[in-house]
Amino acid sequence: MKKVAAFVALSLLMAGCVSNDKIAVTPEQLQHHRFVLESVNGKPVTSDKNPPEISFGEKMMISGSMCNRFSGEGKLSNGELTAKGLAMTRMMCANPQLNELDNTISEMLKEGAQVDLTANQLTLATAKQTLTYKLADLMN
């Protein structure tokens, strides 16, 4: 009985030392990287020739494309990415999924998206949408 009590006490002590909090993504982890969109809400993205992408430059300058090109200054705070003054071209695309993704990325960056970076996978998520990207830097 003493061994069981000692084991339970030790287990509780060790569990108290483990943190389940996620570590927030930092600007340095995103800057100078390009990511290509793989899925929206778990469903694969189809594109003809130019895959939807997002890139992060100096001072968190964001640029990318869905159907249209977009760019703006991003802000990353407590794991949330925003870009309030996002500029975007406005052309209609033949692919309706890409047209809808223009609205999705614009809304996400305006309202704020939770960012997760695990290995080579970037996830931007809100209560309504989840965009999953794969690291695809142009140069190694």
Curated annotation (Swiss-Prot):
The keyword Lyase does not apply. It comes from the Bacteria. Keywords: Stress response. InterPro entries: DUF306_Meta_HslJ, HslJ-like_sf, Hsp_HslJ-like. The keyword Nucleotide-binding does not apply. One of its GO terms (biological process) is response to heat. Pfam families: META. This is Heat shock protein HslJ. It comes from Escherichia coli (strain K12).
